[in-house]
Amino acid sequence: MSADRPGAGAVEPARPAAPRAGNMLDYARRELETFSRRGLCAVDSLILSWMAYLRIPADADEVVAGIRGWDGVRLADLHRAEYFGDYFAGMWSEEDGLRLLAAAAASPRLRDVRVVGHVESTDVRAEKQFAAVTFRLTDDLSYVAFRGTDSTLVGWKEDFNLSFRCPVPSQVAAARYLADVAGRLDGEFVVGGHSKGGNLAVYAAASVPADVGERITRVFSHDGPGFLPEFLSTGEFANVAPRIDKTLPQSSLVGMLLEQQEGFRVVKSNRL
């Protein structure tokens, strides 16, 4: 294998250079190499974090319903099924989500990625809004994505609960989900999420058993809220901290909540 072609489990350096001018849609449309040819970067992570907002209708056909299992469904086939009224319902920008899905479905880099292990759960009484999904990038590398806060009241309540409670129900669910995925899939993992999903990614990576944690190569938190000091002082957090890549848009509100000992980069962001 040539030196400039990373192996199947490769991830680009923790502080990659900014991509060429443009946005996520431009990137998805422009990048042609598969993950076997070029490792995952922060922009790939952000795209996959957005895909965690996907909702699957209860009456979905057999192909799309396969997303809930471990054989999964290709991103391109999700788009082809055309459940456009359901996919990003409740997201703060359904139109942007659909545009990004269309770009991913047409992208040689993303269209054959298999989407597996989709789960979502809302419990009003427990003030829990949780969803997660896993993307099989190569035979040796999977991206575990946690959904951020949606437009529901319970979702926002759980966000505010982060300011005085740890763990909240979704953090517990995230750690269990990541451990379950690791028991089902071989290879290494990158874990990430947008908004609250970024917080869940960090918590899960720090909380799984050591043999699972050793398989996690990177943790991405895109505008994710921070943590209470009690969590940041634990050995579990210290172990995962060097692998955390946290980015905040200049206009960040959610990502500046609580302690910021994870370290972060500020990026310009005003469009998809």
Predicted segments with their positions:
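Alpha/beta hydrolase fold serine-hydrolase catalytic domain that processes acyl esters and thioesters
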Residues: S2-V43, L48-D61, G66-S142, F146-E188, ...
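Gly/Ala-rich beta-loop-alpha elbow adjacent to hydrolase catalytic centers
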Residues: G192-G197, A201
